[in-house]
């Protein structure tokens, strides 16, 4: 176990768990000081801090995997999602996770190259933190879920031309170095690249209209390219704690002949 019933740390030794033939049922004592189990639910922080856990196969009748069910399971390499699961919220701190696989009989979710997608393969929902290198999103993807790439180690992404939506904090605290977003994206939501401490270069498309609060908070940008003919609306905290010298250290690149419109815009 990772934690005792009072929430205190335990020096657990579990490395491989196969409970595919078991059931999770309601009742019994508390775990993590104040939580109780529910029928067929992998509850909030149920396996939290199981530092030696490497692989897990869940019960075949699980219907829901809640937020941070595997919080800080730093050795976890793979998770197998059963056919019955219809709701999943990602877990933080799974720094070694390389593969999320899904039963072929599951109609709510699928996986591609170990990445969790919606059943129709149009949305990326959970990207394993243990993956390295660059990553090209599947051509079918039109949306990226909130926190989907949080804390990931990918340095460069290739986005599909049909991408139309990115969720809040989707790339929060990731290692991304450069970003080129397609023109199909009209707005960037709150905190989408917040605390991306390696992000230097960003390219935004022709139709971008809104940069919400904290989009580039904590990002040491050196070059920001915007091809939209008119400047997008920015929140009062779009760049937040990026620093007082941001306007001196980051070069803004705009379309030829449009500089006066960007200079005249106060928002």
Regions found by a protein language model. Name each.
Residues 2-8, 32-34, 45-46, 236-243, ...:
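Short, aromatic/basic amphipathic alpha-helical patches
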Residues 70, 91, 171, 193, ...:
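Short acidic, glycine/serine/threonine-rich loops at helix termini
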Residues 12-40, 50-64, 73-87, 94-115, ...:
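Structural signature of tandem-repeat unit edges
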Residues 2, 135-136, 147:
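Extended Gly/Ser/Thr-rich low-complexity repeat segments
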Residues 7, 46, 69, 89-90, ...:
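Short, flexible, glycine/charge-rich loop motifs used to bind or transfer phosphoryl groups or to couple energy/partner
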Residues 68, 214, 238-242:
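Conserved mid-sequence domains
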